[in-house]
Amino acid sequence: DGLYAVDPMRVATRTISGLYDGATTAELDELSIRTAALLTGEEPEYGKLAARLLAGVIAKEVAGQEIHAFSQSVQRGHEVGLANDRLLALVQPNARKLNDALDVALDRHFDYFGLRTLYDRYLLRHPRTRKVIETPQQFFLRIACALSEDVPGALALYRRMAELDYLPSSPTLFNSGTTHEQLSSCFLLDSPQDSLESIYSKYGDIAQLSKFSGGIGVSFTRVRSRGSLIKSTNGHSNGIVPWLKTLDSSVAAVNQGGKRKGAACVYLEPWHADVEEFLELRDNTGDEARRTHNLNLANWIPDLFMQRVEADADWSLFDPRVVPEFTDLFGGDFERAYAQAEAQGKAVKTIKARELYARMMRTLAQTGNGWMTFKDTCNRASNQTLRPGNVIHLSNLCTEILEVTSNDETAVCNLGSINLARHFHDDGLFDFDKLAETVRLAVRQLDRVIDLNFYPIETARRGNLRWRPVGLGCMGLQDVFFKLRLPFDGDEARALSA
């Protein structure tokens, strides 16, 4: 496509003015790319220019290592210990067909920031030189081959990804075809049991999952509250805050495969006696020893709490050691057990429900944390909880996944996203047939992830193989409305999105 609004001399002049004596050609390339990118705010076509310049730099970097075809890229990856045997076994006997299928022209679909992110974080790099050993199209074809059983399936998936019709999640993009194929996005861990051994075991599980690019959701509702008696030592517990401080440091220390920061969200039910201190963990003032700036926080709220808020009634806080059954109850069962515990005088403290709710809202407004998630609604609406004994104890890092967890099963979700804006006929109408084909292909790929996956911990393998959950989302709905000239809140837009 012609970039008719771009002034090449303007980019060249600015680039030259930023040079210094002794600058290398690599520095010249990088300066020209960033110069073009900085002009994107004035004219979007400069972003396309920056992307094309960067694509040229990537191609030159790969070719400089004597890698001129997809099969050579996979071979080099295998030689340096990055690509696995299964990928090589598919690629080697089908090298000509796969090499011929690669379409460099599809790089045009990238804008600058997308391609820059791909270059900085996703493309495989030589472990010693740190140079990329694959181009963007070789990257897509590697993933497609790793996720497919045969060449036709690989080529079909490659075209969908290269055209940006559909993309799997980041862990799938990071790790497909590598020696550690951890391809799942989300891991939901039930609360550690109320023991030193269980808490430290949970730290280890979280570190292993984060190491291989997993996002973490974990409950801490079962852990006893501050002041609770420890029978073995006749001492008193410091509550959940010191444990979460340790988890905070661990999440910061163990990043996601060197690609991005570790990330975790901790869920707590509002009857836990440490809930007020929990809501202070992300505050910017106060004792730093009781602050966790790397953890995200979420409230796991039963309907009974909201009913007490509406009625301006009292709310009782309990030590989980005294009422361990609360965590595995929801709906009417929880409400009856809660009322009985109140009547028996087991509460550690009683406060006004609205005061606690106001503190939740203040935390949410000031820090963006303390997300409101509703325990009873989640459990009632789930097909998993129809089986006796199954309970949803939390959501995930991004709060879009709801699955049952237990001490023996870690919930997993395998994610992908369809780009709705890429599903149009040439005449400008939305292509529902193409969407159906993309959905069918995506679901098969996501299901295959479950079988191919490397599981850092056994409880994740057990949960994923038992339930086989997939999460297929979509993006680009606003772009669809824009292309069709539909008001976002209009009846036609509502009908199309439904």
Can you name each region flagged by the protein language model?
Residues 1-498:
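Extended catalytic cores of very large enzyme megasubunits
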